[in-house]
């Protein structure tokens, strides 16, 4: 409330040039008796002089002289004067924004010569230094025309006002919270300025009256002006020298430290182990590396050579630069046949061993003595096959390798003769309903032909007839056999006892279709552990079942 009152009254006193402050400073002697007379408690009786008009006049003159001497004896020194001189020599610029921006260097002063018990009010106003508008051209400021009409003058009263002289002289008086704005409708009390105009800050020290206020006609005050604090208001820095001075001296000037050429300097100041490479240097290195590289070398390799000795801020760029083209993530666009073979058959078979199939954990409890190789010897499920865009397009040239294997693959992966028949696995059940986690895709390149029903679902497995063309089935694969339903005794003979008991019902009829004639020419035995579902058929084909010539249940 005190500051509001002071602002309203001070605006009347400092409104126009030649205001009450200037008039009072010009005629201090004439106005001196009036505030002395208005001061309470200053009478002849109080001073101990005999009553009378002459005594009262003498006492009033002595009190006025003491008050005048107190105001005149106040000395003010500018803090960081050398820094202000550096800015002044280069042409000080101050940023103004709509929201308001603080000044740098901050306006700080050291005050001496005050009466320790008298209360004072300290305030600042910023007035135009001339009537010109400026522009920055050829690395110097030039007059561009006549100044725009001045904004309504505002005063910034120090938050500690009013305070005793002892308080002001105890430490530096800082006006660092003062903000400059170009918003003519600013409601926050910031100093309103016009851009590209020159201004001069002024410090006023006013003696507070009996109401701890100022602005009356007879108020005693003094004004201090430092020419090195003059500046030109700008919305962005024009002179690079001023920008450099702000960066070197302002610890809060973080907005300028992310530029291109200052990255290395800031890295050295912060003593980083790996310097941050600026964008301009990185761009030059990339261009020079690509120009010196061979025409058939991709820009990705050139970027890798330029970045191998440095640490870039974004780790993702380093990962892609260090990776080879075939190791990059798969794109969603179909690639050509020569460049789309990211995984061959052996890799897919090896990676299939480490798959964590949900059906294994859900329907089986694998005994610890049985190796993982019995469960994962087949191609991966169809949902993984459909994730790779290049897999379906390469089914025809790789179907012999994927489903049956040839030569080295049979002996290394699934051609072991001395292995016992595998225990119950996830795709040996004829009574389990299709799993919802498998999204099965019908492959037109491997058509199936209708085949009559060769067995029915009963409690025990009947004898199965041998399939024609036995010459296409190599010896030693009898362990790839059909398991419709095995009793608990059969499980004990072939492996450790499992605690799982099937509770599902058996379907009435299961049809099985023989492999395609396209596969008979290349396949040496039927593929195992895979599901296929035809959208036109209403039954499920369990293709993970092989055949045996002579089957006995006992």
Swiss-Prot record:
Name the SUPFAM superfamilies for this protein: p53-like transcription factors (SSF49417)
Q: Where does it primarily localize?
A: nucleus
Q: Which residues bind DNA?
A: 78-258
What SMART domains is this protein classified in?
TBOX (SM00425)
What Gene3D superfamilies does this protein map onto?
Transcription factor, T-box (2.60.40.820)
Compositional bias per record (Low complexity), positions renumbered to this chain: 18-34
Gene Ontology, cellular component aspect: chromatin; nucleus
Against CDD domains, the record matches this protein to: T-box_TBX4_5-like
Highest taxon listed in the record's lineage: Eukaryota
UniProt GO BP: angiogenesis; cell fate specification; embryonic hindlimb morphogenesis; embryonic lung development; limb morphogenesis; positive regulation of DNA-templated transcription; regulation of transcription by RNA polymerase II; skeletal system morphogenesis
Which PROSITE patterns would you find in this protein's record?
TBOX_1 (PS01283), TBOX_2 (PS01264), TBOX_3 (PS50252)
Give residue spans, biased composition: Basic and acidic residues: 1-14, 491-509
- Residue ranges for the region (Disordered) are 1-34, 488-509
Q: Which keywords does this Swiss-Prot/TrEMBL entry list?
A: Developmental protein, DNA-binding, Nucleus, Phosphoprotein, Transcription, Transcription regulation
**Entry-linked InterPro entries:** p53-like_TF_DNA-bd_sf (IPR008967), T-box_DNA-bd (IPR046360), T-box_sf (IPR036960), TF_T-box (IPR001699), TF_T-box_CS (IPR018186)
Localization per Swiss-Prot or TrEMBL: Nucleus
Report the protein's function.
Transcriptional regulator that has an essential role in the organogenesis of lungs, pelvis, and hindlimbs.
Q: What is this protein called?
A: T-box transcription factor TBX4
Task: Say which species the protein is native to.
Answer: Canis lupus familiaris
């Amino acid at each position: 409330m005190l500051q509001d009152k002071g602002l309203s009254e001070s605006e009347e006193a400092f409104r126009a040039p030649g205001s009450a402050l200037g008039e009072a400073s010009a005629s201090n002697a004439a106005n001196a008796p009036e505030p002395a007379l208005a001061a309470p408690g200053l009478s002849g009786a109080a001073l101990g002089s005999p009553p009378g008009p002459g005594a009262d006049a003498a006492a009033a003159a002595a009190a006025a002289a003491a008050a005048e001497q107190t105001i005149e004896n106040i000395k003010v020194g500018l803090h960081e004067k050398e820094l202000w001189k550096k800015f002044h020599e280069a042409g000080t610029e101050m940023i103004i924004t709509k929201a308001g921006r603080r000044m740098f260097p901050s306006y700080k002063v050291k005050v001496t010569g005050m009466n320790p018990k008298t209360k004072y009010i300290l305030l600042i106003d910023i007035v135009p230094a001339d009537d010109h508008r400026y522009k920055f051209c050829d690395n110097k400021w030039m007059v561009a025309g006549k100044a725009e009409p001045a904004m309504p003058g505002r005063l910034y009263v120090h938050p500690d006002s009013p305070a005793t002289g002892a308080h002001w002289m105890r430490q530096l008086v800082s006006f660092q919270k003062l903000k400059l704005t170009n918003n003519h409708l600013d409601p926050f009390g910031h100093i309103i300025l016009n851009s590209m105009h020159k201004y001069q800050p002024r410090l006023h020290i006013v003696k507070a009256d009996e109401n701890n206020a100022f602005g009356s006609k007879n108020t005693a005050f003094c004004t201090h002006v430092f020419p090195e604090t003059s500046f030109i208001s700008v919305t962005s820095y024009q002179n690079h020298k001023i920008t450099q001075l702000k960066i070197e001296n302002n610890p809060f000037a973080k907005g300028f430290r992310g530029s291109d050429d200052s990255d290395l300097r800031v890295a050295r100041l912060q003593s980083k182990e790996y310097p941050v490479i600026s964008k301009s240097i990185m761009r030059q290195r990339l261009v020079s590396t690509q120009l010196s590289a061979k025409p058939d070398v991709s820009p990705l390799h050139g970027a890798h050579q330029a970045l191998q000795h440095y640490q870039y801020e974004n780790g993702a760029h380093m990962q892609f630069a260090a990776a080879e083209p075939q190791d990059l993530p798969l794109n969603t666009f179909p690639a050509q046949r020569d460049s789309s073979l990211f995984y061959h058959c052996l890799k897919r078979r090896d990676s299939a061993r480490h798959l964590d199939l949900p059906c294994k954990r859900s329907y089986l409890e694998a005994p610890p003595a049985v190796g993982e190789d019995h469960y994962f010897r087949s191609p991966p499920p169809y949902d993984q096959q459909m994730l790779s865009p290049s897999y379906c397009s390469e089914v025809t040239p790789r179907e012999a390798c994927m489903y049956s294997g040839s030569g080295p693959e049979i002996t290394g992966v699934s051609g072991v003769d001395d292995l016992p028949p595998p225990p119950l696995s996830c795709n040996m059940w004829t009574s389990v309903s299709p799993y919802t986690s498998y999204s099965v895709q019908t492959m037109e390149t491997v058509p199936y032909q209708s085949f009559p029903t060769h067995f029915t679902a009963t409690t025990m497995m009947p004898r199965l007839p041998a399939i024609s063309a036995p010459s296409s089935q190599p010896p030693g694969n009898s362990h790839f056999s059909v398991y419709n339903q095995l009793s608990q005794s059969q499980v004990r003979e072939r492996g450790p006892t499992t605690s799982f008991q099937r509770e599902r019902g058996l379907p009435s009829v299961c049809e099985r279709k023989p492999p395609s004639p396209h596969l008979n020419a290349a396949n040496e035995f039927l593929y195992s552990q895979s599901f296929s579902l035809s959208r036109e058929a209403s039954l499920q084909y369990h293709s993970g079942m092989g055949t045996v010539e002579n089957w006995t249940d006992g």
